[in-house]
């Protein structure tokens, strides 16, 4: 993309160059407060699965992103999605969240994370999947579930959506699970929410669900938990 060396004024929501050619269009302040992600349709003229794995597929699409122009090629992984859980206990102002340390081979690092797992059972309710992961990874059950935040893990290269739940009112699970592979060596810690926030801002935590979950939980607490959504709230997924 060619670099533009000029800086034009913003007039009536439009950034213009000295020749008054429209370059960028801005929403009005009134419209900006209502922005929301949404599905949009673009014509795919050709699609092929380049490679299939146990969890993800590599897909190559030829897609028309600008009407009237030739299709462009986009390669991405097709992923079933995942859920994660911020597990919280403690009195107001002294909340603690559960963190677990797990080896992640692709990045060759042991990361402090929150419980999480794949949506690899077709049609399964995301909350049910999150409840299963909490029981399997931490031997706990939660009686209160809310949606904390939703995001796409890497929307430029993957279809993977991820929903983070906030789980409270905890109790021990009836069954203790045998953990295998990387999960067999996990370590656990109850971390004060304020300390977890410091860890994120200090660059000590790198797992995206943990980072986003900590930031969202801290923000939600600061707003009195008023913005939490019900566990079955709508979810933008591909």
Where are these predicted regions, by residue range?
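Active-site-adjacent beta-strand/loop module that shapes the phosphate/pyrophosphate-binding cleft
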Residues: 62-67, 154-174
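Acidic, metal-coordinating catalytic segment for phosphate/diphosphate chemistry
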Residues: 46-86
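Short, well-ordered beta-strand micro-motif
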Residues: 60-62, 87-89, 166-168, 190-192
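Short beta-strand micro-motifs in enzyme catalytic cores
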Residues: 57-62, 110, 161-163, 187
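Conserved Nudix-box catalytic region and its N-terminal flanking loop in Nudix hydrolases
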Residues: 25-27, 41, 74-79, 86, ...
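Nudix hydrolase/Nudix homology domain
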Residues: 13-33, 37-38, 42, 110, ...
């Amino acid at each position: 993309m060619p670099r533009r060396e000029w800086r034009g004024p913003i007039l009536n929501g439009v950034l213009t160059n000295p020749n008054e050619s429209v370059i960028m269009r801005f929403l009005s302040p009134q419209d900006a407060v209502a922005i929301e992600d949404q599905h949009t349709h673009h014509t795919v003229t050709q699609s092929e699965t380049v490679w299939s794995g146990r969890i993800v597929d590599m897909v190559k699409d030829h897609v028309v992103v600008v009407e009237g122009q030739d299709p462009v090629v986009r390669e991405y992984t097709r992923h079933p999605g995942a859920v994660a859980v911020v597990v919280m206990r403690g009195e107001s102002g002294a909340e603690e969240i559960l963190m677990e340390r797990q080896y992640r081979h692709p990045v060759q690092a042991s990361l402090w994370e929150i419980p999480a797992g794949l949506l690899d059972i077709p049609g399964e309710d995301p909350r049910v999947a999150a409840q299963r992961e909490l029981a399997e990874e931490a031997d706990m059950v939660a009686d209160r579930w809310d949606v904390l935040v939703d995001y796409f893990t890497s929307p430029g290269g993957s279809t993977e959506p991820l929903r983070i739940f906030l789980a409270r009112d905890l109790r021990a699970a009836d069954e203790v699970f045998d953990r295998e592979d990387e999960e067999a060596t996990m370590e656990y810690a109850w971390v004060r929410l304020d300390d977890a926030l410091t860890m994120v801002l200090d660059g000590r935590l790198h797992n995206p669900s943990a980072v986003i979950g900590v930031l969202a939980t801290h923000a939600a607490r600061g707003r009195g938990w008023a913005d939490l959504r019900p566990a079955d709230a709508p979810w933008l997924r591909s």
